[in-house]
Curated annotation (Swiss-Prot):
<feature type="compositionally biased region" description="Polar residues">
    <location>
        <begin position="245"/>
        <end position="254"/>
    </location>
</feature>
<comment type="function">
    <text>Essential for biological clock functions. Determines the period length of circadian and ultradian rhythms; an increase in PER dosage leads to shortened circadian rhythms and a decrease leads to lengthened circadian rhythms. Essential for the circadian rhythmicity of locomotor activity, eclosion behavior, and for the rhythmic component of the male courtship song that originates in the thoracic nervous system. The biological cycle depends on the rhythmic formation and nuclear localization of the TIM-PER complex. Light induces the degradation of TIM, which promotes elimination of PER.</text>
</comment>
<feature type="compositionally biased region" description="Gly residues">
    <location>
        <begin position="92"/>
        <end position="113"/>
    </location>
</feature>
<dbReference type="GO" id="GO:0043153">
    <property type="term" value="P:entrainment of circadian clock by photoperiod"/>
</dbReference>
<feature type="region of interest" description="Disordered">
    <location>
        <begin position="28"/>
        <end position="118"/>
    </location>
</feature>
<dbReference type="GO" id="GO:0000976">
    <property type="term" value="F:transcription cis-regulatory region binding"/>
</dbReference>
<protein>
    <recommendedName>
        <fullName>Period circadian protein</fullName>
    </recommendedName>
</protein>
<feature type="region of interest" description="Disordered">
    <location>
        <begin position="140"/>
        <end position="189"/>
    </location>
</feature>
<dbReference type="GO" id="GO:0001222">
    <property type="term" value="F:transcription corepressor binding"/>
</dbReference>
<keyword id="KW-0090">Biological rhythms</keyword>
<dbReference type="GO" id="GO:0032922">
    <property type="term" value="P:circadian regulation of gene expression"/>
</dbReference>
<feature type="compositionally biased region" description="Gly residues">
    <location>
        <begin position="224"/>
        <end position="243"/>
    </location>
</feature>
<keyword id="KW-0963">Cytoplasm</keyword>
<dbReference type="GO" id="GO:0000122">
    <property type="term" value="P:negative regulation of transcription by RNA polymerase II"/>
</dbReference>
<feature type="compositionally biased region" description="Basic and acidic residues">
    <location>
        <begin position="145"/>
        <end position="156"/>
    </location>
</feature>
<feature type="compositionally biased region" description="Low complexity">
    <location>
        <begin position="69"/>
        <end position="91"/>
    </location>
</feature>
<dbReference type="GO" id="GO:0048471">
    <property type="term" value="C:perinuclear region of cytoplasm"/>
</dbReference>
Length: 375
């Protein structure tokens, strides 16, 4: 990118120097073991480098009457001193010199006597060489970065195409770990009962398949839900009547010996007119076994609204039920009224509209209570 600091000339030239050094085939053995091959190898490698690397001092012309432009090549920095300048002394037409990577150079042919005049390396000439080489290396660096950027962009586009191909549906292309609109998450399960609450505002879901105590349950629904619907925060008469009528029907339901594991995927709907949780508890106590079946991915909590103590006192002092063999059902059915009475005696502990997930405020399902008792 344009904001990053470009690499320095030494960093850019590092790989180039290594490549030139090893391409020159340096002789690491002592010179006395193989003296004749030293000079030709360096001269030939320097000529090969001339075709690959351009030197900025290539256009420098040697001085002399018949001398033409010198052929300057770039050799290895490490062996610059060992490379000799060769010229045709007889004719004096041209000379072949070697300049180092740092800017060293050889001289052109003399005016006829074959004398080699070395070129004076000025600071401006070296700076010019370094500037041009730096521009050349930066250009190569940008080209390499551009190629890598295009590859990354292409791979990103391929990834986007794969995601689009997978689609949002739960089909064979459905990806894992990505939440989409069509996925069945716990949030969707929690929102289903809320959407269905508007269908039944009468007080209880019509999902009871009971023959023996259907009449008593319908009476309980009519009295409890009706009382809760017309009750207010200070209205104690209607709420009390709903609570007192709910308990005997609970006993009849418990004595009937019916199955309590009916699977209903609805919370008990809250009526619009209900302002206190007393009528809600007294209403759903009668069929708590049916409406409060095990709900997956749901957290059972209650909203507590401050109410007067007299409003919930009838439900707190419910009559003792007749003894029967379903002791677990009786205990679980009695628990909401007990917790409600405890909550009503301390109305200032809870703030309006807040949810308090305290263990004592939960309603225990009979199956869960039986499992806990067995453990």
């Amino acid at each position: 990118s344009s904001t990053e600091t470009p690499p320095s000339y030494n960093q850019l030239n590092y790989n180039e120097n290594l490549l030139r050094f090893f391409n020159s085939k340096p002789v690491t053995a002592p010179v006395e073991l193989d003296p004749p091959k030293v000079e030709p190898s360096y001269v030939s490698s320097a000529r090969e480098d001339a075709h690959r690397t351009l030197s900025p001092v290539q256009g420098f012309e040697g001085s002399g009457g018949t001398g033409s432009s010198g052929n300057f090549t770039t050799g290895s920095n490490l062996h610059m001193s060992s490379v000799t300048n060769t010229s045709n002394a007889g004719t004096g037409t041209s000379g072949t010199g070697n300049s180092g990577g740092g800017g060293g150079g050889g001289g052109g042919g003399g005016p006829g006597n074959g004398a080699v005049t070395p070129v004076t390396l000025t600071e401006s000439l070296l700076n010019k060489h370094n500037d041009e080489m730096e521009k050349f290396m930066l250009k190569k660096h940008r080209e390499s970065r551009g190629r890598s950027g295009e590859k990354n962009k292409k791979s990103a586009n391929d990834t986007l195409k794969m995601v689009e191909y997978s689609g949002p549906g739960p089909g064979p292309g459905h990806g894992h770990g990505i939440k989409r609109g069509g996925s069945h998450s716990w949030e969707g399960e929690a929102n289903k009962p809320k959407q269905l609450l508007t269908l039944n505002t009468g007080g209880m879901p019509p999902l009871l398949d009971i023959h023996t105590s259907s009449a008593s349950l319908s009476k309980c629904q009519a009295s409890g839900a009706g009382g809760g619907g017309s009750g207010s925060v200070g209205g104690t008469g209607n709420i009390g009547s709903g609570g007192s009528n709910a308990q005997p029907s609970t006993n009849q339901y418990a004595q009937s010996g019916l199955s309590c594991t009916q699977n209903i995927n609805l919370w008990p709907p809250f009526s619009v007119g209900i302002t206190t949780p007393t009528s809600v508890l007294s209403t759903h106590t009668a069929v708590a076994q049916s409406s409060f079946s095990t709900q997956h991915n749901l957290f059972p909590t209650f909203y507590y609204i401050p109410a007067s103590i007299a409003a919930s006192s009838p439900s707190g002092t419910s009559p003792n039920p007749r003894p029967h063999k379903h002791t677990l059902v009786h205990k679980s059915a009695e628990q909401p009224s007990t917790s409600q009475a405890a909550a009503a005696t301390m109305p200032l502990q809870y703030m309006t509209g807040l949810m308090y997930p305290h263990p004592s405020l939960f309603y225990t399902h009979p199956a869960a209570a039986a499992a806990t008792a067995m453990v």
